Amino acid sequence: TLQANNQSGRLFKIITIPNKMPGDIFEEKKLTIGFDPNLFTDKSLFFFFRKSKLKFKPIYQNLIDKIWERKIIKNKNKFYLLPNGAVSEKYQLKVNKISKYLKRKKSDFLFVTASENNAWLLNIRGRDTKYTPIPHSYILIDKNKNIKFFCDLKKVSSSLKRGLKKVNFFDIKDCAKILLGIEKKKFVIDDNSCSFFFKTIIDKNNKILNLQDPIYILKAIKGKREIENIKKAHIYDGVALTRYLFWLKKNFYKKNITEITASQKLLKFRKKNKKFKFLSFPTISGTGPN
């Protein structure tokens, strides 16, 4: 917030959440606000606008997309399976746990919209975002362990299909149509992540249980192999950071080192490890007033 004021305070009015919520801006006005139902949950809308008298109208075509002329082309990097040494459980065992959970809840389906949970469940990763190895996807799993995986099919390789033999792959654009074809069933959805769009579709002909996605708890319990790999990752990164600090101490007064060149040097040290894939976040590099 401090940096926002310094950089943009003259051009924009900076409002800090939670000191002031978006709904507070409109005060007592009775307005109708359009929103993209794919990008919001009804829970998030209520949280940000709970004190307002606004009405919300879903707009099913994103208006920003209509005027975005130079849109970034999405990458086509393939999804990939994690090696056996990187996981503590095969995906079939994880699916068994979900099946038992659904039977306990007397439910037919779990609809998973959090991509990181899909990655954990199937022991896969992707490169759909710059700093997090998640595959943008949805999963529909029933109590009988049948799995429908919705994604960009161009990112599904033959090796991925071989490794996930019991998973049925569908184009992500067909997800809504398939959900609309299901009737008189009981769904578990997490309204912290399931969009207004999908919740409305499911709720049309089915009963919904709003519960936390059970995968959050399951993946929080780390296995022995996962714990070992976490420790190794910290050691690998610690070695790179130690080399960088030694270099910085040696060259601090000899070279003109900027915030940018410093972060680039640290990245070079990290890349010397053959197991390095990419950063988990941009290096926070600051000096002087920053």
Question: Where are the predicted features?
Answer:
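A composition/biophysics-driven feature that prefers long, compositionally simple stretches
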Residues: 1-271, 281
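Short secondary-structure junctions
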Residues: 274-277
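Short, structured beta-strand/loop micro-motifs enriched in basic residues and often containing a Trp
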Residues: 285-290
